C-alpha cells in the first residue's frame, strides 16, 4: 500500500520504517528540512536498536523516502498517518496545534478518498476535531471529497520499538467506518498472521485506551515506590516484597520494580494530560494526581540519600553517575531522573562524572560544556576522582561490576543503587556501603 506519515520523530520514523519493511511504499513528511536531508543521507536522529538498519535498507530499496513537500505526499498516500508531537501545554494538557495543523494541510490538498490515521497520543475527542479540521478546509475549497478518520494509537516501548512495531501484541483501531477498518486490516495483515491482534472499537475508546495503558503502567511504578518508601521505614526489603506479590498471577512481575522514578516522553506527559482531561470534564482524578506526586518525590530520592550520606555537605564532592538516559536501550533524556539528580548536585556545589552507553551526545546537547560535568567514555572512567557512585539507569553493562575495583577507586566507597541492581550483602561484603531503594536495613532510616 502507499502510505504517508506526517512526522519523523520517534513514532513516525519507527512506524514508517516498519511499514516499508513489510513492502509498503512510505513517504515520511517533516517541516524540518535539515532533518529530512540527514535522513536521506542515512543519519538517524535517535538511538533505537534495529532502527538504523531497516531505515537504510528500505530507503535504498525505494520503499521509504523523506520529504518536506506536503502536496505530493498527500497525493501519494492511500493512508495518511499523523505522528506529530503533542507536547504538554502550560496547564499540562496536550497541545494539539501540530495535529490540527496536519489535519488542515490534508484538507487543503486532498484529492480523493483517503483514510486519515492518527498515531499521536491525543485527548479523547481528537478524531472529531481532526475530522472537523479536514472538513473545514474542504468546505473552504468548495469541494466534496470523502475521507475517514481513524484512531490507531501506538504502543511502542523505547529500546524495543522496532520489535514492538513488527510484532505487536495488539493493534487498536478506533473507527466508525467499515471501509476504513478494511483499509487498516489490509495494511496490518503482514503483522497479524499468527492470530488476530486487531481490536476494533470507536474512536473515543481507542483514544482513551492509549492514555489508560500508560497511566496504568505509571501507577504500578508509583505504587511500588510507595511500598519501597514504607519498607525503608519499617525495616523490610522491598525486593523480597516484590517477589512475594509478583508471584500472584493477578499481579505479575511486570512494572513492579521500585527505583528513582519514571521518565521519558510518555508516562509523565500522558498521566498529566489524562488528569487534566478528566478535570476539564468535571472529574477529579485523585489517583492520577497521586501517581504524579509520588513520581515527583521519587525523582529526588537519590539526591536525598547522597545528601544524607554526606550530612548535607556536598560542596566540593564529586559524584560518579552510571546511566543518564531515562531507561536502557535509548538515548532519550526527556524527564530522566538523572537530570534532576545532576541539577540538584550542581546546586549543592558538587561535581558529576557520568557515563551512559548512548546518551552522551544528548547530555552534551542539553547542558553543553560545564566545569562541574565530565562525560566519560567508559564506566570505570567515571569512578576516577569520585567520592561515591550512583547508579541511575539499569543498563545491562552495569549489572555485574567489579566491586573490588569500585571500592579501590572511590574516595568514600559507597554505592547508591537507584535501580536495585545489586544484592546489598554482596556489595557490603566487598567493603562498600550500600544504599538502595526500599532495602530496609541498608538504608538506616530512622522514624
Q: What would you call each of these model-derived segments?
A:
Residues 1-447:
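Structural/interface elements that position substrates and couple domains in central-metabolism enzymes
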